[in-house]
């Protein structure tokens, strides 16, 4: 079995999905798409505004529709929103149509990356204990969805991409 043509990066907000997916798309010659950017384009609103004006349930429905559309295409690096794993159909869709890579980050690393960001809808008003509970609730879902897990602890974006490329080669050799 060859590697699926789409690669989906999943992980908690602040794990580095956007930075890694950008570099990885350049290195692998694949098109970069972001579920959040697609939603913002379709809605004409920022993610923060969608959460405020229409609620998280509406956002998650849009996220599922965008993922369905993206999975009909090929040759992409899909930068997934941190909560995409919250809906079971998304997990099935990703596993069927993508090689799913989970960027695993330690809570203290996430906190350090997120504390200066105000554009995180589920973080900006939340305290660390709430973030930890949210992360804890998603961990089993990230792990269940992932074909490959990469720790981002103490690694640069380039190091994470190199490790992903190594894992992709290993995955292709063991799967094919």
Curated annotation (Swiss-Prot):
It catalyses: shikimate + ATP = 3-phosphoshikimate + ADP + H(+). Keywords: Amino-acid biosynthesis, Aromatic amino acid biosynthesis, ATP-binding, Cytoplasm, Kinase, Magnesium, Metal-binding, Nucleotide-binding, Transferase. It holds the Pfam family SKI. ATP binds at residues 14-19, 120. One of its GO terms (biological process) is chorismate biosynthetic process. The keyword Transferase applies. GO terms for molecular function: ATP binding; magnesium ion binding; shikimate kinase activity. Its EC number is 2.7.1.71. Mg(2+) binds at residue 18. The keyword Acyltransferase does not apply. CDD domains: SK. Coiled coil: none annotated. GO terms for cellular component: cytosol. Pathway: Metabolic intermediate biosynthesis; chorismate biosynthesis; chorismate from D-erythrose 4-phosphate and phosphoenolpyruvate: step 5/7. Its main location: cytoplasm. Substrate binds at residues 36, 60, 82, 138. HAMAP family: Shikimate_kinase. Catalyzes the specific phosphorylation of the 3-hydroxyl group of shikimic acid using ATP as a cosubstrate. Monomer. PANTHER family: SHIKIMATE KINASE, SHIKIMATE KINASE 1, CHLOROPLASTIC. This is Shikimate kinase. It comes from Dehalococcoides mccartyi (strain ATCC BAA-2266 / KCTC 15142 / 195) (Dehalococcoides ethenogenes (strain 195)).
């Amino acid at each position: 079995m060859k590697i699926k043509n789409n690669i989906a990066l999943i992980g908690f907000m602040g794990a580095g999905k956007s930075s890694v997916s950008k570099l990885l798309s350049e290195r692998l010659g694949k098109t970069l798409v972001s579920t959040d950017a697609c939603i913002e384009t379709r809605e004409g609103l920022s993610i923060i505004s969608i959460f405020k004006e229409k609620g998280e349930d509406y956002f998650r429905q849009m996220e599922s529709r965008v993922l369905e559309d993206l999975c009909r295409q090929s040759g992409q690096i899909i930068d997934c929103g941190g909560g995409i794993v919250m809906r079971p159909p998304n997990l099935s869709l990703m596993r069927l149509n993508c090689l799913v890579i989970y960027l695993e980050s330690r809570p203290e690393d996430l906190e350090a990356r997120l504390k200066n960001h105000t554009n995180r809808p589920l973080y900006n008003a939340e305290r660390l204990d709430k973030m930890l509970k949210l992360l804890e609730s998603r961990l089993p879902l990230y792990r269940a969805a992932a074909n490959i897990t990469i720790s981002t602890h103490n690694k640069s974006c380039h190091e994470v991409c190199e490790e992903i490329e190594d894992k992709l080669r290993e995955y292709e050799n063991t799967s094919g």
